[in-house]
């Protein structure tokens, strides 16, 4: 049995993670208004945003289907970082991040339209950043890659060169925790293999 799986996100990295493990999602980016969420608690922020994204898309769908919403931020030194506002912002952030340890938080909301049930979880991974030089920081920012990433780096891209160590879930840093997703699917009463597409990853 193949269950329709909907990803309420425009993130190419999240879609690729799912495709790598055999899940070919229907991608329906959410137009949830993130500005209405004002909490300064990083865990509450990512779970609230993930839920908002998933619910907007779920309300437009018919059962049976599973809808996944995700949101990620980097917490470092008590500050919350989403996507940078531009190259200079990325440079400024990396000057703060270099040589430091941050926490990458990803909120996951999985909605089962058939059972009218949803699960909300947060995965946290610690990331040690390398002590980059000013030239390395500017060169990386000017590639444009960090401008599209929560936390200002892409672990699965050039940014992977500037991460010294990860403690916790690797895929969580890229955009969603595959082990956590499997657990959530199981908790809803499904087998993750029910989501596999007929095509090879």
Swiss-Prot record:
An annotated GO BP: nucleotide metabolic process
Pfam families: Maf
Enzyme class, UniProt record, top EC level: hydrolase
EC number: 3.6.1.9
Keyword Cytoplasm attached: yes
InterPro entries from the UniProt entry: ITPase-like_fam, Maf-like
Keyword Hydrolase recorded: yes
GO cellular component: cytoplasm
One function term, GO molecular function aspect: nucleoside triphosphate diphosphatase activity
Cellular compartment(s): Cytoplasm
Entry annotation: catalytic residues: 71
Protein's job: Nucleoside triphosphate pyrophosphatase. May have a dual role in cell division arrest and in preventing the incorporation of modified nucleotides into cellular nucleic acids.
Family per record: Belongs to the Maf family.
Name the UniProt record assigns to this protein: Nucleoside triphosphate pyrophosphatase
Organism: Acaryochloris marina (strain MBIC 11017)
